[in-house]
Amino acid sequence: MASKSNKQVTVEVSNNGRSRSKSRARSQSRGRDKSVKITVNSRNRARRQPGRDKRQSSQRVRNIVNKQLRKQGVTGPKPAICQRATATLGTVGSNTSGTTEIEACILLNPVLVKDATGSTQFGPVQALGAQYSMWKLKYLNVKLTSMVGASAVNGTVSGVSLNPTTTPTSTSWSGLGARKHLDVTVGKNATFKLKPSDLGGPRDGWWLTNTNDNASDTLGPSIEIHTLGRTMSSYKNEQFTGGLFLVELASEWCFTGYAANPNLVNLVKSTDNQVSVTFEGSAGSPLIMNVPEGSHFARTVLARSTTPTTLARAGERTTSDTVWQVLNTAVSAAELVTPPPFNWLVKGGWWFVKLIAGRTRTGSRSFYVYPSYQDALSNKPALCTGSTPGGMRTRNPVTTTLQFTQMNQPSLGHGEAPAAFGRSIPAPGEEFKVVLTFGAPMSPNANNKQTWVNKPLDAPSGHYNVKIAKDVDHYLTMQGFTSIASVDWYTIDFQPSEAPAPIQGLQVLVNSSKKADVYAIKQFVTAQTNNKHQVTSLFLVKVTTGFQVNNYLSYFYRASATGDATTNLLVRGDTYTAGISFTQGGWYLLTNTSIVDGAMPPGWVWNNVELKTNTAYHMDKGLVHLIMPLPESTQMCYEMLTSIPRSRASGHGYESDNTEYLDAPDSADQFKEDIETDTDIESTEDEDEADRFDIIDTSDEEDENETDRVTLLSTLVNQGMTMTRATRIARRAFPTLSDRIKRGVYMDLLVSGASPGNAWSHACEEARKAAGEINPCTSGSRGHAE
């Protein structure tokens, strides 16, 4: 730029040489001048304030220059639409090895920016990415929100860095410092800010959206998060294993060039927390990764990949066209034995794989390993220069955590199944479909023999039983015990989900010492007679400290050869003393079965009694695996809860009503409480009280629960409970017809995507129609908690 002050400004843009975009054939073929020269007269005719005149002149010059550059095509196409979004991508875990560990690798292509929920659900950025052919970023902020206090942990530093090539590299902590990076102190929030100059693409700053195209044109840069130094608890002399930071990505994506590829929104990202991984290869052969066939990772890849069956020559192997990024966030990455020379690739923490068509070992799936995305698209696997050392071949597979992302979709039209609009957020108490893969029988159990169970409540002298306990008054003794090889979590509509957190307040104890966490529970209630019920409780636990117990064992057997095989099971009277070992980190399914005499109240049943010798038991779903050991790798699916349903009545063996929050308020009640205000006007206090405590709905003429509801209310009030709380409990324990209709309609509308306000309004309207009354529910009068 050369000019005199406030006279003329001349800008010359030289475009010598070939453009970075190979698609601009028109500009290469025409014999025109490749230099753009812009002259702007910046002199102002009128006198103005010196500072203001200078600023306005600079802005005017800038606008004119930008306009001329756009006309000449130097800055690329104009954005058609821009979208700001903040994506929550997960957490940064603690460092358990003391070396450099990768915690996250964030790909910035809009169709790949997803959290690891394991579903095809998407947001506005992914939707726009599937509609436009090009994208770029105006800015990018990576926000790290601390999840621990500054004094809670020590010994670890985190680093956020920019990888402009999105290719796995062998980097030490010093190498990461050579990149554009930000070091973050644990316990403090931080933001890693990037500008357009850091994020520009090869086509005048733009990137291609379709991930089936050349890798260097589509992926864009990536953000990597590493930790260094073992994370230690400041309050305990032990390692800290929780999360350190919550990672959020705030940015503005711009799109241009409409080209709909609807199937790009269906790319999957998920996590497999318990998967056994091995690598194999020999000199001159491709590097192969093996995982169990029943693992969540293998099943997802198999379901989402298209494998050719007719294009391979004899003796050759073909692969799927679908590429997957694999990120190993566990410390076990350093323990994985890999044939040379690609040890650095696996220890670096992430790589790319493709499913090998038709190649399966007994119980495993195989994948070719690729050191870059472009190599995966070109089908150039990593070639080994040697084999695994002999002493390492016999090592057991390493159990690790894999976070995997589907990188491309060969077919870009509409998929077989429509994508889901919205999000499924696991919450405490939510019901999951849990697929359990059974392991080998636990000693003293053996194949083709009876399954041993713990019979009495006492243990041999000097030993203790295993108890699943909430507190000293509410616990159950372990009877059945089964080893679980792997656990896969799904939402109630069978969408893959992350594992929930352990159930708070519930733990596995041996002599008052915690040995395991409980992740999911289930109770099966079978009515034997009107006043006699069989209750089987299932507990899915993960052992935190390995242990062994000695118990008196017995087993179930069929009482006679005649009659219903599901209703004549007995327990052998004689017992056998044996030891049972539980391995640290292992999953186990523990059971307890009891007979309850009398009416069954709602809620979780704590009935700790031993198995009775002369009592017939029914074969319910919780006892199926306790008759004979199931073959290894057998899978069973249970619908389980992640919190304990609270009891609503007092009695022997049940949880008493001694807490302030007996029931968590349901969604409908919570919404109604939220819309109440202190400015509501009632006609009289008496009318308000009469309306508030009217638990007998006169519109429900066929309400069979009326007597029970009134009886429970009177009992609770006589025990000293307030009328408000007693009414609330009674209405929930024995809901009226109107209550049931409201709740059913409300939950159905919420699932379909309606807002809470609209859902509750429609639910009230349906309840009024069913009751035959016209009685305002939320408008014009106070919304009462029903």
From Swiss-Prot:
Outcome of swapping residue 432 to Y: In strain: Oxford
Superkingdom in the source lineage: Viruses
Region listing for Acidic, in residue ranges: 649-786
Region (Inner core): 71-263
Annotated protein name in UniProt: Capsid polyprotein VP90
Stretches with biased composition (Polar residues): 1-13
Effect of residue 704 to G: In strain: Oxford
Known outcome of mutating residue 754 to V: In strain: Oxford
Native organism: Human astrovirus-1 (HAstV-1)
Note: The sequence shown is that of isolate Newcastle.
GO biological process, one term: clathrin-dependent endocytosis of virus by host cell
Record annotation: effect of changing residue 276 to P: In strain: Oxford
Positions of region (Basic): 1-70
Compositionally biased spans, kind Basic residues: 19-29
Region (Core attachment): 394-423
GO cellular-component term (any): T=3 icosahedral viral capsid
Outcome of mutating residue 19 to N: In strain: Oxford
Keyword Lyase: no
Region (P2 globular domain): 424-648
Pfam families with a match to the protein in the record: Astro_capsid_N, Astro_capsid_p
Effect the entry attributes to changing residue 292 to S: In strain: Oxford
